[in-house]
Amino acid sequence: MTRRMNFRSKKAARQRGDAMKRIGRILLCILMITVLFGISIVGNFVVKSENKSKEKKRTAIAKEEMKEWAAPDEETLKYYDLGEFSTTLPVIYMNTKGQQILKENVICGNIALLDGNEEAQSVSAVPNSIYRATIKYRGASSYSKFDKKQYRIKFYKNSKENEKKVSLAGMGANSEWVLNGPYLDKTLIRNKLVYDLARELNGWAPDTRFVELFVDGKYQGVYLAVEPVTNGESRLRLAEFGLLSGETAYVVNRDRIDTGTEEIETWGKTKGYTYNALYIRYPSKNKITEKQKEYIKNDISEFEQVLYGENFKDKRTGYQEYIDMDNWVDYFIINEFAMNYDAGNLSTYVYKELGGKLQLAAWDFNNGFDNYQWFHTETDRLYTVENSWFDRLWQDENFREHVCERYVQLRKTTLSDEHIADKIASYQEKLGDAVDRNFKVWGYSFDENLLAGTDKDGMSRNIGSYEEAMKQLTDTIRERLAYLDKELGGN
């Protein structure tokens, strides 16, 4: 009996001991979790503090970087009667390091940035940041005929192999950018206006910012910093992987023959239904495979065969299976609003997500609203309906109905008279004195006969002043919308 009781007491003691061990392990785990959590909090605090300190350090470039900054040239500023002026716009300082800028090949230089903060800053103030960059000219007629050049720039870290994502003028960080210099467009705002309106519609459109540019210390006037149609986190956000079959997300653009690489000959081109050339822009020429090239060519060819086939109107088996209808309708409307004669034939960007449908990205409206160099564009006719792909789409009453219904909606919002007027007024306020500075450099362009032909009244289309340019733009927009109200709005 006594032996049995001793056994039970020992067993109970062991159980109590095991329980205490379990409790001890639990307490130890809790303690470890608490310590780790504390370390995490402290670590995050340290990282954030370090980041903040880094941000504070980058409010101005370091002393050792000053020699890389091509500061404003005092003699040039005096020559244009500008002096050491201040601006509320972001300022870009391009340093070519004495090299000639080319269109065919990039040069390596650096670019310094003075961030705009809504308050006037001297353009001689120390920039906020400076980066290595490649620089080249871009454009077709703007490159060959106009003194004010367009630029394509790309930021890098320490070498040309390591791209650097930069938030240019407050836009989403990316390494590739376009600097559009309005020359033919004396209002300086055509591209900005249409891009901003397009960003309110279905599909992707570029973000933009007004900036002032210096190249090797010489003032170049007002430019528009523009997101090019590329893939990336702040851009199209297409899949960066492909399938073994060759299927891939892609970007192509239609433009003049011999203006790009990686051209594809699709069914529409070989059969004479489409014009100019299609170039693959994504995946890049350094990464694309032959299977992917073949897939992109066949994918667009299949769409074209259906579009120009007998049963193209069929809602299940016709062209609607291949395109994002809402996006294509909005693209059609914004280009007709801008009187963009080129839409579908030139500067036309098409993109497709892996497993998705074809979409279009708005691009290049410098010639919009009767600003073509070679001829007068009338406000009372449609243009896109005559161009590649859209000539066939317009034959489908369902597409036309979608366009008309959407146009009526947009006239109450994005394309309302009030909204457009507010946009234009905000741009003029934003630019302020920068307009005068721009034309102190490029004012002689008012004396050039850049626009051929005459307007509807038989008068020269050439603009004599900034005020005249603004009046021409607003008058053209008013007349254009009045026509579209009748043609698309049912009035």
Question: How should these model regions be labeled?
Answer:
Residues 43, 142, 281-344, 351-491:
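Middle-to-C-terminal accessory/interaction subdomains
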Residues 159-160, 204, 218-330:
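Internal "kinase-insert"/substrate-recognition segments embedded within catalytic cores
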Residues 151-154, 175-181, 188, 212, ...:
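Structural recognition of the beta-strand scaffold that forms the well-ordered cores
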Residues 122-124, 146, 164-166, 190-191, ...:
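Short, solvent-exposed loop/turn and secondary-structure capping segments
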Residues 201-212, 340:
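Short, well-structured beta-strand/strand-turn elements
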Residues 183-203:
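A conserved alpha-helical element in kinase catalytic cores
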Residues 2-11, 16-17, 21-132, 418, ...:
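Regulatory N- and C-terminal appendages and interdomain linkers associated
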Residues 121-181, 295:
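Conserved oxyanion/phosphate-binding beta-strand-loop segments in alpha/beta enzyme cores
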